[in-house]
């Protein structure tokens, strides 16, 4: 980890500046899976236009590269279920398109099922050795996982959130994190929704009432703030 000029990195954000100690921050890449982001996956089976999510990939890659260069903690999540579906509630499987459900065969294998091609993370953001990959059975990344244990063990207090979709898995994770005392910065250009109105509403909810759930910023402002605190990043680009 490169030495910073100051103890804190200060990022312009809403409702006000987000500050973090670089030794206590982690990046969450939430559910950038083929099943949600690529054609032929679970998201498309529900009638969604998956192209609406792809705009979040490139800016997320820039943030991911920054965290990798600094050797800061990176955690990837994948929503999905065991092959025998023993961790899938009937109420969840029964929702959505009645002709194609979780566990059924799609173009990329069984939908939202661990071990299938669709369940895996997209190549553009694929984890490298040493990065945590959490398989979660629900929408929030804390439910049914050891995410909190990993964060506490690493001394993490602040989270940078990216991923899909804004109003479902990202929002659920942010709320769970907030209740556990973690400060969250959601990067608006590193997340996306199938529904533009849901995307906008979710971001407003995050930052409402003085940041009731967390802060909202952009990848550009985050990377600029890191560059200012750690000049070596900028010099190496």
What are these regions (language model features)?
Residues 33-39:
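Short acidic, Gly/Ser-rich segments with clustered Asp/Glu that frequently serve as metal-coordination loops
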Residues 42-52:
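Short glycine-enriched, charge-decorated loop/helix-capping segments at active-site entrances
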Residues 1-26, 35, 53, 62-70, ...:
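Active-site-adjacent betaalpha module
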Residues 76-85, 91-92:
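Catalytic-core segment of enzymes that process non-peptidic bonds
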Residues 26-28, 75:
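Conserved hydrophobic packing residues within short motifs/helices of P-loop NTPase cores
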Residues 72-79, 187:
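Short beta-strand segments at enzyme active-site cores
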